[in-house]
Amino acid sequence: MRKGIYLRIALIAFTVILAIIFFLPNTPLFSYMPGWWKKNLPHKGIVLGLDLRGGSHLIFEVDLKRAREITVERIGMHLQSLLEKKGLKPSVKVQGEKIFIQPVNEDVKKIIKENYADLSISEHGGNIICELPETAFKRVETTSVEQAIEVIRNRIDQLGVAEPAIHKQGENEIVVQLPGVKDPKKALEIIGKTAQLEFKLLDEETTLWKQLPSLIKAGEEDTFLNQWKSKLPESDEIVFQKIVNKETGEVYKRPYIVKKDVLLTGDLLAEAHVSIDQRFNEPYVSLRFNDAGAKIFEDITGKYVKRRLAIILDGNLYSAPVIQEKIEGGNAQISGSFTLEEAKDLAIVLRAGALPAPVKLIQNVTVGPTLGKDSIEAGKMAVIIASIFVSLFMIIYYRLSGVIADFALILNIILLIGALAALNATLTLPGIAGIALAVGMAVDSNVLMFERIREELRLGKTPKAAIETGYKKAFWTIFDSHVTTLITAAVLFHFGSGPIKGFAVTLSLGVAINLFTALIGTKTVFDFIYIGKERKSLSI
């Protein structure tokens, strides 16, 4: 009997020491610890959530429909190039998720089957129609979200944000948490920019240039496009270049007619960095393509000498220089009315790679560091006040047994904080609410046991026998209530978002630790007091 009690005391002491070791990195004392301690023992501790230390919580939605269309467009481009190399010059057009090839040719069908086994081929109205099966599109959707996560992660890494959290949510949503970010607006612009870099030829042969206005006001692009849609050849489209009046600051858009066919994309970029034009002292973005991109760029510039090549990023034309000669080495540049910061941001998104499809911001919650600090203080105060009032009530109502319950309460808080630190859990404001709830539940368990003990004492049992019977009878009631709470917490964790998950984690840990402190902690104290002694009364 005595040996069993001492073993339980040793177990409690061990768990307390372990909890303190794990929580130590979150205290000022950690800075005084020797080097060997920091190297060999836990050094991370509890991570504060965005609502406590400030930062941005962003949710992006990947445009999966556009991802499907982009995939088909790329296949169409590749087929066009492939067929031309084979000496065939069919018309290849992409409409939505279908590729139309004219004329119908058995050699063309054979080349398609050899290179794209997934494509289903049919004939209709003098066209070869190519389509991807739904299974292939599902792979495209999954891959697009995964690639978008990687691209966003690369961009955030270049921003230098410490401990960002990025993960998939649902089918096509990406959750991005940026703790302590100083410029949320800039971060949002860099993360959300699609960075689809495209090189297209200007259509210099069309007579529509004479009717085209030199400038339109910014914001009138949609109206302008609707007016011109019916006038354009099927193979052309209009893109705009941003023009800023340096004197007034007014923004205008200059329309250009370009070919829809994409000659080269930013997928083949190897490097992008900011350079300064020595003649005009203006920044520009210098590009270098990889070997495959350099070869394509060389072919383009060799084939279209004296033609204007439009450099388009996310649908906006940046420049349209005249190709003077074949360019070898795969070097190009994007110039425009950049500030140095704008050029740097553009280089970042190009270096990190293009998003596989456009992303749309559907939620943006930004918490300032001051508000986060206030939340921590308010949360601390709530837990402290709750603990004090609960402790006083227990002492007044249950006397010495109330003191034992308060010991269990302190033990519960120490072990809970230690467990959170051991898991490197992210503590949010709802998480603090979970701690406060765990405090209430810890006391609730003791109340159940103490009332059972009182009932046994009224039946005439000795204090020692009343304690034993009271604990046995209360055990299953306490156990059942805690298991049902754990089930609820598990559901919250599975279906909830970040803050709700934080609440679920602290609640789950609190429930598990509460079982330990209530059924082992307080029982050990009672056994220690009454070991080898038969007291006639019990302060309860």
UniProtKB/Swiss-Prot annotation:
The chain crosses the membrane at residues 4-24, 376-396, 403-423, 430-450, 475-495, 502-522. It comes from the Bacteria. SUPFAM superfamilies: Multidrug efflux transporter AcrB transmembrane domain. It is a multi-pass membrane protein. InterPro entries: Acrflvin-R, SecD, SecD/SecF_arch_bac, SecD/SecF_CS, SecD_1st, SecD_SecF_C, SecD_SecF_C_bact, SecDF_P1_head. It is found in: Cell inner membrane. Pfam families: Sec_GG (PF07549), SecD_1st (PF21760), SecD_SecF_C (PF02355), SecDF_P1_head (PF22599). Its main location: membrane. One of its GO terms (molecular function) is protein-transporting ATPase activity. One of its GO terms (biological process) is protein targeting. Keywords: Cell inner membrane, Cell membrane, Membrane, Protein transport, Translocation, Transmembrane, Transmembrane helix, Transport. GO terms for cellular component: plasma membrane. Part of the Sec protein translocase complex. Interacts with the SecYEG preprotein conducting channel. SecDF uses the proton motive force (PMF) to complete protein translocation after the ATP-dependent function of SecA. Belongs to the SecD/SecF family. SecD subfamily. Forms a complex with SecF. Part of the essential Sec protein translocation apparatus which comprises SecA, SecYEG and auxiliary proteins SecDF. Other proteins may also be involved. This is Protein translocase subunit SecD.
